[in-house]
């Protein structure tokens, strides 16, 4: 195993809350997959959930070396949780293609949040 990419992102939760208040669910629909949107609609603090997913997907895109754009969209990166609640990152479409181009086989993710911020780090391995 070798590390082939690493990315980190931090998001101010209040900024997400303000966008949600101003634009409704427009950002959520752009960032979240259908499965993630279903969870977002059911959680108690949707702006916190969205901030964590936004940070996670930005971190994953940075680890891929592209950022969002250049063939990788938010919809190509899916964040879920295993049976113990640990986060998982999965790649499809353009993100999966980029991972393969890098010789990657797996992504590891850590997500954390506090009162004001959400942060995520993604490590890609070959």
Curated annotation (Swiss-Prot):
Keyword Metal-binding belongs to the record: yes
Broad class of the protein's primary localization: cytoplasm
CC terms in the record's Gene Ontology section: cytoplasm
Gene3D superfamilies reported for this sequence: 4'-phosphopantetheinyl transferase domain
Positions bound to Mg(2+): 9, 58
MF terms in GO: holo-[acyl-carrier-protein] synthase activity; magnesium ion binding
EC number: 2.7.8.7
Record's protein name: Holo-[acyl-carrier-protein] synthase
Gene name, Swiss-Prot/TrEMBL: acpS
């Amino acid at each position: 195993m070798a590390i082939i990419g690493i990315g980190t992102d931090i998001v101010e939760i209040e900024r997400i809350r303000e966008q949600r208040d101003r634009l409704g669910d427009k950002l959520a629909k752009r960032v979240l997959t259908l499965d993630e949107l279903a969870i977002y609609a059911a959680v108690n603090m949707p702006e916190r959930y969205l901030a964590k997913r936004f940070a996670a997907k930005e971190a994953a895109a940075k680890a891929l070396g592209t950022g969002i754009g250049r063939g990788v969209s938010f919809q190509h990166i899916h964040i879920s949780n295993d049976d113990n609640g640990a986060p998982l990152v999965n790649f499809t479409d353009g993100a999966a293609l980029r991972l393969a181009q890098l010789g990657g086989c797996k992504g590891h993710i850590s997500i954390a949040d506090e009162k004001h911020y959400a942060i995520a780090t993604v490590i890609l391995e070959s």
